[in-house]
Regions:
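Inter-blade linker and blade-boundary elements of WD-repeat/beta-propeller domains
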Residues: 2-17, 49-70, 98-142, 171-195, ...
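Loop/turn-rich, solvent-exposed surfaces of beta-rich toroidal or solenoidal domains
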Residues: 199-213, 222-256
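Beta-strand-rich domains and repeat architectures in extracellular enzymes and scaffolds
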Residues: 14-40
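Loop/turn segments within WD40 beta-propeller blades
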Residues: 24-30, 70, 75-81, 125-128, ...
Length: 310
């Protein structure tokens, strides 16, 4: 007897068992959240509706899901009009005004230059400031971060370095070989840099090396955070560093190195943290990773509810 193929609903249910949400980006108005997964999809959530006191379960599901790329969507970034998505060897632009409508298509596709037909880069990080092609890393670049109020960008990669670039000239102006500093080196985990954030003269980065706070002007580590597991994403928030990585926890870290809190989350590992400063209702943080659920925090001490990537 021939076996019939599973229906679309069954196939989707199986797919959701293996979904990882790799990237998030808030809409310019603060009312929506875009989240991207490893099956090439971008989901749009009505964040304002989900935060409403009258919210129902359906308000916490995606209002639209767009098949954006053939491969995983590794990164998202927003402008005042556009949502940019990065996948294997390509960047696509989408109109925020059209994303929730049926039949939405990308506005354009760009393919960064490659040195050979065999080199198809993963677009792991996006920042909206296209001026130069910056070359210097010896391996994959995992993350980039623009410095506020300065024409500079930081990049971290598989080669264990963080590099500071001048966007006026495209020149590298500083090199920090993170894995060579004994304070934060963890050779048993590797030298790769996966997370990177900057604020004023400070930087926090980690991955194989321990998550560490650095003073950029002097190029020296000042605080090594005592987290045993590799961290995948970190950001500054008020007087804290927020981070997530291997393990189902959001870490709240004081700049002194003390752990202010370790908050349980739904994903088995975190890959993306997203602050929503323009959210009209609350100060909101969303966290995502190895799960179809995206946890929403309106208070850093506990999860308020979860959005569902279905």
């Amino acid at each position: 007897m021939a076996l019939s193929s599973p229906s679309g609903g069954v196939r989707r249910a199986r797919q959701l068992l293996h979904v990882s949400v790799l990237a998030q980006s808030a809409s310019p108005c603060g009312r929506f959240l875009a989240a991207a997964n490893d099956f090439g999809e971008i989901a749009i959530f009505g964040l304002s509706a989900a935060l409403s006191a009258e919210a129902k379960e359906e308000n916490r599901r995606a209002v639209a899901v767009v098949r954006a790329h053939n491969g995983p969507v590794y990164s998202l970034a927003s402008t005042e009009r556009l949502l940019l998505s990065g996948s294997d060897g390509e960047i696509r632009a989408w109109s925020w005004a059209e994303l929730g409508r049926k039949g939405c298509r990308e506005l354009w596709t760009r393919r960064p230059p490659c040195r050979s037909s065999l080199e198809v880069p993963e677009i792991n990080g996006l920042e909206v400031n296209q001026r130069h092609e910056l070359r210097g890393h010896q391996d994959l670049v995992h993350v980039v971060a623009l410095r506020e109020q300065l024409p500079q960008v930081l990049s971290g990669g598989e080669d264990g370095t963080v590099r500071l670039w001048d966007l006026r000239t495209g020149a590298q102006v500083q090199l920090i070989e993170v894995h060579k500093y004994q304070e934060c080196s963890r050779p048993q985990l590797g030298k790769w840099i996966r997370c990177l954030a900057t604020e004023s003269d400070w930087m926090v980065c980690g991955g194989g090396p321990a998550l560490t706070l650095w003073h950029l002007r002097s190029g020296t580590p000042t605080t090594v955070f005592g987290l045993a597991q590799p961290q995948h994403h970190a950001l500054f928030h008020q007087d804290l560093v927020l981070s997530g990585g291997v393990g189902p926890a959001l870490h709240l870290l004081q700049l002194s190195g003390d752990v202010r809190g370790k908050v349980p989350v739904t994903p088995a590992a975190l890959r993306s943290l997203c602050l929503h400063p323009r959210s009209p209702e609350h100060q909101v943080l969303t966290v995502a990773g190895n799960s179809p659920k995206i946890d929403v925090f309106t208070n850093l001490g506990y999860r308020a509810f979860s959005l569902s990537f279905t």
